[in-house]
Amino acid sequence: MKEGMSNNSTTSISQARKAVEQLKMEACMDRVKVSQAASDLLAYCEAHVREDPLIIPVPASENPFREKKFFCTIL
């Protein structure tokens, strides 16, 4: 019975060490305020609006997925 408790204790110590290492890594990361990230994202979207085919459609002549205008009839 004592071995089971020792093994369980070792496992929880190992998990705690991993958690501490993870928290140390996260504490060193640079953080950005949400308002700043949103502002940066908005500026990026506005700067690249002309390249976005969902906002400015691709000209039909350049669209590889356009409908073909050829009709085939079977007689």
UniProtKB/Swiss-Prot annotation:
Keywords: Cell membrane, Lipoprotein, Membrane, Methylation, Prenylation, Transducer. The modification Cysteine methyl ester is found at C72. SUPFAM superfamilies: Transducin (heterotrimeric G protein), gamma chain. It comes from the Eukaryota. CDD domains: GGL. Signal peptide: none annotated. It is a lipid-anchor. A lipid is attached at C72 (S-geranylgeranyl cysteine). One of its GO terms (cellular component) is heterotrimeric G-protein complex. One of its GO terms (molecular function) is G-protein beta-subunit binding. Disulfide bonds: none annotated. InterPro entries: G-protein_gamma-like_dom (IPR015898), GGL_sf (IPR036284), Gprotein-gamma (IPR001770). Coiled coil: none annotated. It is found in: Cell membrane. GO terms for biological process: G protein-coupled receptor signaling pathway; negative regulation of cell growth. Residues 73-75 form a propeptide. PROSITE patterns: G_PROTEIN_GAMMA. Brain. G proteins are composed of 3 units, alpha, beta and gamma. Interacts with beta-1 and beta-2, but not with beta-3. Interacts with KCNK1. Interacts (via C-terminus) with KCNK2/TREK-1 (via N-terminus); this interaction confers ion selectivity to Cl(-) and L-glutamate. Belongs to the G protein gamma family. Guanine nucleotide-binding proteins (G proteins) are involved as a modulator or transducer in various transmembrane signaling systems. The beta and gamma chains are required for the GTPase activity, for replacement of GDP by GTP, and for G protein-effector interaction. This is Guanine nucleotide-binding protein G(I)/G(S)/G(O) subunit gamma-4. It comes from Mus musculus (Mouse).
